[in-house]
Amino acid sequence: MATHLVYPLLTAEAFLQIDFGDQKAELDNGVIRMMAGGTARHARVQGNIFLALALRLRGSGCTPYNSDMAVRTRPDSIRYPDVSVFGGHDGKSDDDAIAFDDPRAVFEVLSDGTARTDLRVKLDEYRALPSVDTIIFIDIANKRVRIVQRTGPGGWVDNSYDDPTEVAIPTLDITIPHAEIFARD
């Protein structure tokens, strides 16, 4: 007779207490999902976005975070966007935070292994957060940018750009040139 192990589903709070060491994981509907490492190209584009945001947002009250900062998207889901921007978390009381639940903008750098989840599951989770105004997907293989922006209660506009375009983020009052996102130096 076969034995089936049944594991209890985790809450976001329980998940955040687990030390995964060098490994990365997300919590998806109470289930731990291990994450693979990225490529050099992925890391470069992620770094370019973070740097562009950090330089433009300094002194604005908004702070960009890399993928070390967790976003609590639901009581049973924790995500680690490639880059996220939060407002109002710049006080000393937030210095030891490991997760926030109110990003204003979220960036996901797509890879073959994550694109399906990023473009479906995570998009829905991010859109459900009242604080999120802008979700940006970066397709590094094709140098495409997809910008999903809130237009009001329940309204969203979704634009994809195949040609180089400036990435405007009205909620943050900044623009990032396409060339800066994909820069190799």
Where are the predicted features?
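Gly/Pro/Ser/Thr-rich low-complexity, intrinsically disordered segments predominantly at protein N-termini
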Residues: M1-D185
